[in-house]
Structures are given as C-alpha cells and as structure tokens.
C-alpha cells in the first residue's frame, strides 16, 4: 500500500473573519494523482498555498513526508520546497526571458550545476512536454497551450516529489486540454511524481485521477 506524502489534519484557515476551512482533513497518496474539486471561491488555490507553506493555518497540521509544514523554519521550508513544483493558473512565466531560461531558472536558483549540464536538463524537460523546438522563443511568442506546457516544464526540472496544478485546463481549447491531461498522467508515471490537481473540469480530471475530493462549505463533502 502506498504511503501518504501529504496529510492535512484538522485544518482551520480564515481570511479576516471569514472561515475558509473548518477542521478539514484529507490525504494524498505517494505516486498517485489526487483531484480536488469544488465550486469557485471555496479556497481550492488557498489549499495549495497552505500545502506549499505560503500561508499558515489558524490550527491543524499539514504533513509533507512526515514533516509539519506549519512548524518549519524558513531554511527548512526552503529545503522542502525544492521537493515541490507548482503550476499556477496564470502559468506565471517570466516575460522578459526565453522559454529556455524560464525552465532553467529554478535549476540555477537551487543548484550549482555547470551550464552544460543545465542545458541538457532543460532540453530534456522541454522534450518531455513537446517544446524542445520552442527553447529560444519568448513567452509572448507561445500560444496559450504552449505557455501552459512551458510552465509545466519549469515545475519539474529538479524532479520534485510533489507537483501541484492549479486549474491547469482553464482557457485551453479542446486539443490543448487533451494534451495537458495526457501530459499530467504521463509525467506522473514517468517521473514517479505525486500530483494534486485542482480543477472544476470534472470529466478531464476524473479521467486521470486515482482519487478525488470534493470540497464545499469549508469541508470535504465527498471523496473516493
């Protein structure tokens, strides 16, 4: 049986006086694709930021491989984040540098590898998402689907244990959506990833998810 890479226990989180989560509990199995669904505005993106340590809850635990994210020092959190990749809804590519340099950025930030090796890694990751030929293009020259795939390549160069996708299908045409759905599945298997996918595109995400949670009214209301 797979162990849990993520365990959220009795999580309560507020924005001002508004309660976003009240005693929320969920688990993410290692090596699996877990879907998180629910209506807009209930804090699905907020949950990813809590798991990534960007936000702190009022109470509860968020365990990543047994470590409570909420209790880590800044240095410890920095080390843990090297094992995480995030693909936000916006894609969030740096607009003033090439696709190649976007993917290379986290490698240069977190390692001291020689440029020759960085080049090999970046081209390999671009190849994995079907963008090797776009390495020298600027983000403004990419289509919406290509930009989303470039952002995905930038999330995986350090071979993370966990990758979190925030509405990865939003704004994509049916062909691009199909490509991204299959990429998430293929990369999860090829890189032995654990994936959390936040989405309201039910058909797409359930076609690849191993487990799904539906969140509404501050709680998990269904799972399976």
Regions found by a protein language model. Name each.
Residues 52:
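Helix-to-loop junction immediately C-terminal to a conserved catalytic motif
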Residues 67-68, 115-133:
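Conserved ABC ATPase "signature" region
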Residues 159:
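Conserved catalytic motifs of ABC-family nucleotide-binding domains
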Residues 37-39:
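The feature captures the beta-strand-to-loop junction immediately N-terminal to the Walker
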Residues 138-142, 146:
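Conserved ABC ATPase signature
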Residues 163-166:
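Catalytic Walker B motif of ABC-type/P-loop ATPase nucleotide-binding domains
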């Amino acid at each position: 049986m797979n162990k849990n890479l993520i365990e959220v226990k009795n999580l309560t989180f507020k924005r001002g006086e508004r309660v976003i989560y009240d005693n929320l509990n969920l688990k993410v199995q290692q090596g699996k694709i877990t879907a998180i669904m629910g209506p807009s505005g209930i804090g699905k993106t907020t949950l990813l930021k809590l798991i990534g340590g960007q936000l702190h809850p009022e109470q509860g635990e968020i365990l990543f491989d047994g470590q409570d994210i909420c209790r880590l020092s800044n240095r410890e959190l920095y080390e843990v984040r090297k094992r995480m990749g995030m693909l936000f809804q916006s894609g969030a590519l740096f607009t003033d540098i090439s696709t190649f340099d976007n993917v290379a950025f986290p490698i240069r930030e977190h390692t001291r590898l020689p440029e020759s090796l960085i080049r090999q890694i970046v081209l390999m990751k671009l190849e994995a998402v079907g963008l090797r030929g776009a390495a020298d293009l600027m983000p403004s020259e990419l289509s919406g689907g290509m930009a989303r795939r470039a952002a995905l390549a930038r999330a995986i160069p350090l071979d993370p244990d966990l990758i979190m996708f925030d509405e990865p299908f939003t704004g994509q045409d049916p062909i691009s959506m199909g490509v991204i759905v299959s990429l998430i599945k293929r990369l999860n298997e090829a890189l032995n990833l654990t994936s959390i996918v936040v989405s309201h595109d039910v058909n797409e995400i359930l076609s690849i998810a191993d487990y799904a949670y539906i969140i509404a009214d501050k709680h998990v209301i269904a799972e399976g």
